[in-house]
C-alpha cells in the first residue's frame, strides 16, 4: 500500500504537492481592484437604509469600468484630433458631453466641475 498524501492514485485529478519545507513563504493572492467601496459610499449617501447584493455590486463595477473606458477613449481621440499629448479636464468634459445623453450629460458636467473645483481648492 502506498503512503497517503505522497503519491497520486491512478485517475486522480489533483496533483499531489510535496510538503513545504519549514520557513517556506505562503503565496499571496493578487488583489482585485474594484469600485465597490465607492459605489457603496454613494449608495449610503443617497439611500442610507438600502443594501446591495454582491451580484448587483459586480454589475455596477462592470458599468463603472465600461463608462470609464468609453470616456477615456473618447478623450484620447479628442487629444489626437487637437494634436495635443495631454488629456485635460476640457477633453474629459467634451467626451462626457458626446457620450451621455441630454440632461444626464449636464448633470455629469456640473458634478465633475464641482469635484475639480473642490480638488483644486483643497491643494
From Swiss-Prot:
GO terms for molecular function: DNA binding; protein heterodimerization activity; structural constituent of chromatin. Residues 10-32 have a biased composition (Basic residues). There is a cross-link at residue 118 (Glycyl lysine isopeptide (Lys-Gly) (interchain with G-Cter in ubiquitin)). The lineage of its organism: Eukaryota, Metazoa, Echinodermata, Eleutherozoa, Echinozoa. Its main location: nucleus. Residues 1-32 are annotated as: Disordered. GO terms for cellular component: nucleosome; nucleus. It is found in: Nucleus; Chromosome. This is Histone H2B.1, embryonic. Gene3D superfamilies: Histone, subunit A. The nucleosome is a histone octamer containing two molecules each of H2A, H2B, H3 and H4 assembled in one H3-H4 heterotetramer and two H2A-H2B heterodimers. The octamer wraps approximately 147 bp of DNA. CDD domains: HFD_H2B (cd22910). Glycans are attached at residue 110.
Amino acid at each position: 500500500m502506498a503512503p497517503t498524501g505522497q503519491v497520486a492514485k491512478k485517475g486522480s485529478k489533483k496533483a499531489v504537492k510535496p510538503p513545504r519545507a519549514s520557513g517556506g513563504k505562503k503565496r499571496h493572492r493578487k488583489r482585485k481592484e474594484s469600485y465597490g467601496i465607492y459605489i457603496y459610499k454613494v449608495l449610503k449617501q443617497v439611500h442610507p437604509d438600502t443594501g446591495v447584493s454582491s451580484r448587483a455590486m459586480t454589475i455596477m463595477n462592470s458599468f463603472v469600468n465600461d463608462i470609464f473606458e468609453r470616456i477615456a477613449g473618447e478623450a484620447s481621440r479628442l487629444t489626437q484630433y487637437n494634436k495635443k499629448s495631454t488629456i485635460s479636464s476640457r477633453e474629459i468634459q467634451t467626451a462626457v458631453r458626446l457620450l451621455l445623453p441630454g440632461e444626464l450629460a449636464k448633470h455629469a458636467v456640473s458634478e465633475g466641475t464641482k469635484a475639480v473645483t473642490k480638488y483644486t481648492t483643497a491643494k
